[in-house]
Regions:
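Short, positively charged
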Residues: 9-117, 121-373
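Short acidic, low-complexity intrinsically disordered linear motifs used
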Residues: 1-10
Length: 373
């Protein structure tokens, strides 16, 4: 297999529903020879041939359920045209496996751990096509355990590895916002969204913090709660992010300690090839990866058993978490691919515990990805 030389990044992340269903069904229509002269997502039977679908009744039902409420004609047409443009390249590559596009299936709203393809090829040695529209699902939404990080159940991972520094950071953040609220009694403060607010009642000497949960409490009660995250604490996280440039020194001791702890642990864990392969979503079968940056062919996991971690660099924190840059390569290559690994508050700082997200894969040709178009 010849790997082409190119320098591009593959970025993923964000909300997925509308973009996901429009892009996936549009690609399915393009490769299944659908009649698009009068496509109606509420009546897909009239456009998509039943004999091209592995489970036609179930697929039609899923399209009506998932695409209809999210249908965007312009977005759908964009991806349909992209599918048509890449159809020949897909068939040319399938010919290497003595295959061609035949019957297909659709994952629907399910994320399949054992299959990277959103649109699957029935009876083929190639799994299908993984479609990643802008705002689509990340390469891997992982638990911290996937990086070798093992916090106690229910604990914030930053708290687990640096308890004193974590509590000190949150205490400073909480104190600043509480003082700001006290200076403006009765005034609702919403640093980010009006869904997450704080207001001080001067007569009761208490604060009301509103989020997905609400509390009314005095200053000591609030400050004594810094060890655990909670939905009502989102307003403090929003305030810190809004004031990151001025207040980032509050996080320096925490992030300095975490960087040392995480870098060693993650690097040791990722030296295991299976951890790398799972993170990069290599699968038992090869598959196509289609995004706004082009069409790629991703080899099977058996073809990248020699993939190795060359190093792990610590990135610059952005106020929501930690960034690490993994450098990956094949043994016969001096050039490396780079992968950004975020341990971050993706669902609201201090509202929920951090998650691990893998994003921005740069120079994927150095780990076996082949660019086709």
């Amino acid at each position: 297999m010849r790997f082409f030389e190119f320098n591009q990044s593959i970025n993923e992340g964000g909300k997925s529903s509308g973009r996901r269903y429009n892009s996936e069904i549009a690609i399915l229509c393009a490769i299944a020879d659908a009649d698009m002269s009068a496509f109606d997502p509420a009546n897909p039977e009239q456009s998509i041939p039943a004999d091209r679908l592995e489970k036609s009744d179930a697929t039609y039902k899923d399209i009506k359920k998932l695409l209809v409420p999210n249908y965007d004609q312009a977005l759908f047409q964009f991806w349909y045209k992209k599918g048509l443009a890449y159809k020949d390249a897909i068939n040319n590559k399938l010919a290497d496996y003595e295959s061609q596009i035949g019957q297909v299936n659709w994952a629907g709203g399910k994320n399949q751990a054992d299959n990277a393809a959103d649109v699957g090829f029935v009876g083929s040695d190639v799994a299908g096509i993984s479609i990643k529209a802008e705002g689509g699902i990340t390469l891997a939404n992982l638990t911290p355990k996937a990086l070798g990080l093992t916090p106690d159940k229910g604990n914030d991972i930053f708290y687990h590895y640096a308890q004193d520094e974590f509590k000190d950071m949150k205490t400073k953040i909480f104190t600043d916002l509480l003082n700001q609220a006290k200076e403006q009694p009765g005034q609702v403060i919403a640093p980010g969204s009006d869904k997450y607010t704080i207001v001080y009642d001067e007569n009761a000497d208490k604060f009301t913090c509103t989020g997905k949960k609400k509390i009314t409490a005095d200053e000591n009660t609030i400050l004594n709660a810094v060890a655990k995250n909670s939905p009502w604490q989102r307003v403090f996280g929003d305030w810190f992010q809004a004031n990151w440039q001025a207040k980032k020194a509050y996080a320096t001791p925490l992030f300095t300690k975490i960087a040392r702890e995480f870098e060693t642990t993650i690097e040791q864990h990722l030296q295991q090839n299976s951890s790398l392969a799972n993170m990069l979503r290599f699968s038992d079968k090869p598959y196509f990866y289609l995004s706004t940056s082009g069409l790629y062919f991703v080899p099977s996991i058996s073809e990248v058993q020699d993939l190795a971690l060359r190093g792990l660099k610590y990135g610059t924190p952005d106020g929501t978490g930690q960034l690490f840059v993994a450098q990956l390569a094949r043994p016969d290559s001096e050039a490396v691919a780079e992968l950004d690994i975020y341990v971050r508050y993706a669902n609201g700082m201090f509202e929920t515990n951090p998650t691990v997200r893998v994003q921005t894969l740069r120079n994927p040709q150095y780990i076996g990805w082949e660019k086709l178009a």
